[in-house]
Amino acid sequence: MGSSQSVVTALQTVLKQRDLKIAPRTLQNFMKEVDRVAPWYACSGSLTVASWNKLGKELDRKHAEGDLCLGTKAIWKLVKNCLEDEACHPAIIESQGTLEEVQDSMSETERSERMGARKRKDMSKKKGPPQEVKKGGEKEGSYHSPLNKSKKKKKPESSQYPAVELEALELDNSDSDTLDSSEEGGLEEEVARYEEKRYHPDRHRPLKTKMNVRPPPINPAGSRPSAPPPYELRLNTGTDSFLPLEERRKIQMAFPVFENAEGGRVHTPVDYNQIKELAESVRNYGVNANFTTLQVERLANFAMTPTDWQTTVKAVLPNMGQYMEWKALWYDAAQAQARVNATAGRSSGHLTKIVQGPQEPFSDFVARMTEAASRIFGDSEQAMPLIEQLVYEQATQECRAAIAPRKSKGLQDWLRVCRELGGPLTNAGLAAAILQTHRYRDLSNRKACFNCGRMGHLKKDCQAPERTRESKLCYRCGKGYHRASECGIMDSGADKSIISLHWWPKSWPTVVSSHSLQGLGYQSSPAISASALTWRDAEGKQGCFTPYVLPLPVNLWGRDVLQAMGMTLTNE
């Protein structure tokens, strides 16, 4: 009987790991049936899947012969599901050790008695389980009716396990080894619900207890968990999230929420004893003592909110001055960690591509380089030698010349030296602006008027009366209303020929030249033919040239055409 009781204790430990509780009397009846069917299990069995499956085959054989009590197979299924669950592995190892100790202490006489008893039972077995009938028609050892059980039922003791207890199945605690059909069906339903909860956790709804009251905390009195338990999930259909139930439990542990019996979320303050012990440690040993540090580390095991930490520190420190100092340091550490979290893993490109602009201040360039390096390396102080080398190589020539004699002084000294370098207000910037202004002024004075031909103003600003066009066609070309003396002016000293925009076909393409024209007038970025043109004279001579196209009243033939014709410019 002692070995069977040890197996019952081991089974209770395994079932409690899955929040299942079966009455000890029911497990004892189950082990009696196991000892009758397979007495070898108490001697050499183990809490392994292979050994339990072997026991299941023995039970199936007896069930096929009609020699198995009701409810035995259902309890076997519950234990098998627990053995296959990885969450029950620690409890299984502990129970297996207890079972092995009992088996080792079992004498050879007891072993032989168990095996001999099995042989005697096998020889005297019948087709059905032995039952004796009393005069009243009631079978001996049978369970009482539900009506009688309600009268004899004792007040259940308060359990410290929040799962649904199997006493809701109304199993009797009598000495009978058999179960009636209703109890067998209830136990089978419990097995089905357990398997549904295990293999389909998202479809499972939390079962309500008899009194519809939130179960008590899991931990027994006197012990404290490492972190507060998360609030209970209230799932509807399981289709509102793609995450499995276990993953959602891990997410909730990041910031636990407490719920009361009605389901409302409440705030649970820090335990008074914890605060009292920490305050006494600070008062007796100081804030830097090892014992005080240990107390703080003990508090760190709990999932405390920022408000909880502030309240706790304010309560344990002796004065508000130390609290304000701690709060300032705490804020600095939180902001530093927030910056690290925000910039970690977000690089802004290659550091070699960050170059100081011509008009960019040296301080802005250093700030861009330091920010990019902190995003890549995390801590910019550790990468400071690399940052200094990149800043020196990719700064402007003026800044490099100022840094070179003080290259070993560090980045702060470089910022001080280059503070006045770069930007539009430097000597180089002012000189460039002055030269640019004088250049534009000189160019404006060298422009010629197309109306009067004088320098210093444009045609739109000319005060002279506008010249009228000739009313007759030119007798030389027969095309334009101009004088013959102005028709196709020959070499005027120009190197390139210029075609009047009036005679240039609109379908011929032009491009903007990168050179400027300067003679009697000035033209910046003039238009030039997009392709070379071919000219041919009356004598059969021909050549190629690329003329400029300007809004002139006449065409100007330059040396690029006249020299090919064999003409030269003389002063005769």
From Swiss-Prot:
InterPro entries: B_retro_matrix, B_retro_matrix_sf, Gag_p24_C, Peptidase_A2_cat, Peptidase_aspartic_dom_sf, Primate_lentivir_Gag_pol-like, Retropepsin-like_cat_dom, Retropepsins
One biological process term in Gene Ontology: viral process
Residue ranges annotated for the Peptidase A2 domain, each copy included: 486-561
Ranges annotated as biased composition (Basic and acidic residues): 132-142, 190-199
Annotated site residue numbers, Cleavage: 92-93, 255-256, 299-300, 431-432
Coiled coil feature spans: none
Compositional bias ranges of the Acidic residues kind: 167-189
Zinc fingers classed as CCHC-type: ranges: 447-464, 472-489
SMART domains attached to this UniProt entry: ZnF_C2HC
Annotated segments matching region Disordered: 99-230
Comp. bias intervals (Basic residues): 117-128
Entry EC no(s): 3.4.23.-
Alphabetized CDD domains for the sequence: HIV_retropepsin_like
Residues at the active site: 491 (protease)
Alphabetical keyword list: Aspartyl protease, Hydrolase, Metal-binding, Protease, Repeat, Transposable element, Zinc, Zinc-finger
One Gene Ontology MF term: zinc ion binding
Protein name, entry field: Intracisternal A-particle Gag-related polyprotein
Source organism of this protein record: Hamster intracisternal a-particle H18 (IAP-H18)
